[in-house]
């Protein structure tokens, strides 16, 4: 938690001035009951209208000064809390960018969104309230008690009894509810996760007529959240009635003692009014303090959750130095897997086992296998999205762990299974590949990706707007644009992870032909379910349940690999299976 306080360093002045101005406001408020007592004891008793007007003027002046102090305090507290949450949100987002796929998988997208939004908003609100009330409320409570002693010592003893009782109630509720708020936030994460999952997969839900099932799942999770919120609410709700009971009993005692003191001449009527006002001030401030404690308890629980994300260490460390010379025997190597195994965090079984192969510069490598065979897992090791748990992965003669992040990303471009575009324009999306690319570079990449024709057909061409997620484009258009984006960076290794699944066979064939015709020695990995897309590859890796079932050319695999032969035969006529 101390690390999070570092983000307040730029707002030390505001953190000091906000509570000081609130205490100044409170100081003027403490004089109000004494002025009212004077009005009753002197002005009303003597029927002195001028004296009453003078004292009313003083009350008005105290109110104006108090308002000015309050507004100033609010300005400083808002500046500090908003600035703090902004800095913390930036730091949290920047930290999330350093996390590997492993940490992202472990934490979960919905959890991170909650930390960035709901949790940080709670922290901001809690800090704002804390800066305004953490000194003011105790100051008024103890200040009112001291002022009560200046009025009448015997009556003030009632304050000595009431304040500890009120403190027990307030702090008791705080101790009980603080851990419960953590549970509330955890269950809120679950509800948000289900909501996100449902909205993301809305079309699938409707296609399988599972609307009611999803409603039931949501209602179950929401019921658990509601149950815990009600439990916390019931405990928190005890605070106000208990404090009011104690305060009202104290006021009754004050009136009794005051009446006795007035009867014996120890007090004036105005003094009783002042004491009751002080008791009411204590009541108001303790209610504020109670709300402050509830809000701060929520904020601390949320801050702990944000801190947990900040404390999550990136599982991958990247060196700063570029690796040295390539050994002579590896000069022609692009990618080498040496007895590689991969087991995801929290997974019971390995996704890849004992994978070994070498891809040379300029080769096209096909990767094929059944669903869940480990195709995407294999190619994700090349750009180091994950680290192999066994064996080693090398690119251009050096282990992937020896490359700085920027160097590695510059050498390897990946087109993911899911075509992801960002809100902006076609141009802005393509420039992700290379911010300095010219229009000629962009059009060349679009030509290779078979996307130039449909981009030319758009009224604004490269400047055609793209909605978030590419909602205004078809699946095939999105895939071609993501391929073009990868080509803009002119990588040495291009990975197409089943990224042409939405393309028709003719477009797919044209894409492969265009890739083969590119100048240079770019190594291409094509992950596909279509045997036809891979049969002209220099090598084809056949995966079966995480194992390398076959390695060779199309003809070699048809002759030697039953798994490949079965895949090929299932997609073509049996009579053509050996062709």
What do these predicted ranges mean?
Residues 1-31, 36, 44-60, 65, ...:
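Membrane-integrated ABC transporters
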Residues 10, 14-27, 38, 59-62, ...:
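Transmembrane helices of ABC transporter permease
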Residues 10-13, 98-102, 118-127, 131, ...:
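An intracellular "coupling" helix at the cytosolic face of ABC transporter transmembrane type-1 domains
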Residues 48-50, 54, 147-161, 231-305, ...:
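Helix-loop-helix
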Residues 314-330:
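Pre-NBD coupling/linker segments of ABC/ABC-like ATPases
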Residues 326-579:
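ABC-type nucleotide-binding domain
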